[in-house]
């Protein structure tokens, strides 16, 4: 089995369905004998360019270990899910379990905003 990193851009109006989508995809992976090593919800972020006339999207990052057959099934599910605007799958050499650079930036931004709110109060 190989290690993969999947980044999903979800339609911003479907943000409430993100946990259910994650559970469905996790179920597909574990049913095929794979493992989920890391799931990060980067939240709603600004897009660099418009995708389907949208300026924002909900970002997810999933690191998994799965077979090629499971990956084909998952990518097939991404293609037929209208809520998934874009997806990118990258083969990794080893399992990634620590926080990604993007997640560290998100946490840093949240800490900075919380600190600014404390100063404002």
Curated annotation (Swiss-Prot):
Keywords: Ribonucleoprotein, Ribosomal protein, RNA-binding, rRNA-binding. GO terms for biological process: translation. Gene3D superfamilies: 3.30.70.60. Residues 105-115 have a biased composition (Basic and acidic residues). GO terms for cellular component: cytosolic small ribosomal subunit. Pfam families: Ribosomal_S6. Residues 102-121 are annotated as: Disordered. The keyword Calcium does not apply. It comes from the Bacteria. GO terms for molecular function: small ribosomal subunit rRNA binding; structural constituent of ribosome. Belongs to the bacterial ribosomal protein bS6 family. Binds together with bS18 to 16S ribosomal RNA. NCBIfam families: S6. This is Small ribosomal subunit protein bS6.
